[in-house]
C-alpha cells in the first residue's frame, strides 16, 4: 500500500493511493497514520479495504508528511562510505546517531526555508524507515519485522551550524522545514529489499546525487538493531538512514549551497518524489 496524509498543515487526513494513483480518503476508518495504525494488525485492516469503495479526494490537495505524531526523528550520519570521503571524515565503526527535531518535519512539496544569514544550507536525499511496533534489544535477523514502511526524506542541513559552530549536528539539522517526509508511506510488503533502492536528487534540474542503498555502511536491519539497544523504538518513529555522495559541501572545486528561489527535486525508486522551492526564512 501507498499511504499518505493530505490537507492543510495541522489538519491532514489519512489517505491511500488507488490502482490509478488517485487519493482515496481513509478518515472514516482511521483518525491518522500514526501509533497503532502502523502496526501489522492496523495495516492489515487497511489492506482489507477495497480502495474503489472509499471516497475519492477531488482536486490536488497539499500532501503532508506521510506519518503523523512522530515521536522520534532519528538521523544517521556518514552511512555511505563515499559520502564520508567527500565530507573528509572517516568511515564510522559504529552508526553516527543524531536527532532531528520533530518541528522540522513538513510535507514533501512544502517550501524549504533558508535560515536567516545562512550561506551553507545543503541537501541530502535519504531513505526513511518508519517503525510500526515497539522494539527494544531486537536482533538484526528480526529487525525488519518492526518496520511499518519506507519513505523519502530530505535531510536538509545547515553546514555552518552543524560543523563549524561547535560541531553540534542537532543544531544544523533541526531548523523548521529541514525534514520533508513523503509523499507516501510504502508498506514493507512492497519493498522486499530496502538495500537495493536507487535514490537521487537534483537542484534546478542538475543531478547532484545518484546512489543506491546497497552501498550503505550499516543496513536498515543493522541500524534498527543498534538503535534498539540504546532506546525503545516506538510506532511512528522515523529513522533517516544517511545519504549517498553528491551533497553540496562535497562539490569540487568549490562547495555549492542552496539559495532562495531554487527547485529541489528528489526521489527513491518505488517510494515517490519530492519537489521543494527554497525561500528565505521570514
Swiss-Prot record:
Record keywords: Cytoplasm included?
no
GO BP annotations listed: urate catabolic process
Tell me the cofactors it needs.
Mg(2+)
Please report the name of this protein according to its UniProt entry: Putative hydrolase Bmul_3283/BMULJ_05242
Quote the record's binding site residues for Mg(2+).
124, 126, 155
Citing just one GO molecular function, the answer is: ureidoglycolate lyase activity
Task: Give the E.C. number(s).
Answer: 3.-.-.-
Q: Which InterPro entries match?
A: FAH, Fumarylacetoacetase-like_C, Fumarylacetoacetase_C_sf
What does the similarity note say? Answer: Belongs to the FAH family.
**UniProtKB keywords:** Hydrolase, Magnesium, Metal-binding
Amino acid at each position: 500500500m501507498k499511504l499518505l496524509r493530505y490537507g492543510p498543515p495541522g489538519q491532514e487526513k489519512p489517505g491511500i493511493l488507488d490502482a490509478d494513483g488517485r487519493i482515496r480518503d481513509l478518515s472514516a476508518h482511521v483518525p491518522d497514520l500514526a501509533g497503532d495504525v502502523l502496526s501489522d494488525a492496523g495495516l492489515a485492516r487497511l489492506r482489507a479495504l477495497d480502495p474503489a469503495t472509499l471516497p475519492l479526494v477531488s482536486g490536488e490537495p497539499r500532501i503532508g508528511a506521510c506519518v503523523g505524531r512522530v515521536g522520534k526523528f532519528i538521523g544517521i550520519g556518514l552511512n555511505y562510505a563515499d559520502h564520508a570521503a567527500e565530507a573528509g571524515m572517516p568511515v564510522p565503526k559504529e552508526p553516527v546517531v543524531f536527532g532531528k527535531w520533530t518541528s522540522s518535519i513538513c510535507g514533501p512539496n512544502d517550501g524549504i526555508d533558508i535560515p536567516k544569514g545562512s550561506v551553507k544550507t545543503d541537501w541530502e536525499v535519504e531513505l526513511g524507515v518508519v517503525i510500526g511496533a515497539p522494539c527494544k534489544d531486537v536482533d538484526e535477523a528480526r529487525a525488519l519485522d518492526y518496520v511499518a514502511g519506507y519513505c523519502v526524506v530530505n535531510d536538509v542541513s545547515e553546514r555552518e551550524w552543524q560543523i563549524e559552530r561547535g560541531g553540534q549536528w542537532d543544531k544544523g539539522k533541526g531548523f523548521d522545514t529541514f525534514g520533508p517526509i513523503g509523499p507516501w508511506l510504502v508498506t514493507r510488503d512492497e519493498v522486499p529489499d530496502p538495500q537495493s533502492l536507487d535514490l537521487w536528487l537534483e537542484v534546478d534540474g542538475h543531478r547532484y546525487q545518484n546512489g543506491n542503498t546497497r552501498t550503505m555502511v550499516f543496513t536498515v536491519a543493522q541500524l534498527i538493531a543498534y538503535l534498539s539497544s540504546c532506546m525503545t523504538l516506538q510506532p511512528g518513529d522515523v529513522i533517516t538512514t544517511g545519504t549517498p555522495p553528491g551533497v553540496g559541501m562535497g562539490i569540487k572545486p568549490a562547495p555549492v549551497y542552496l539559495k532562495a528561489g531554487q527547485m529541489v527535486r528528489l526521489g527513491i525508486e518505488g517510494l515517490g518524489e519530492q519537489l521543494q522551492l527554497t525561500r528565505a526564512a521570514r
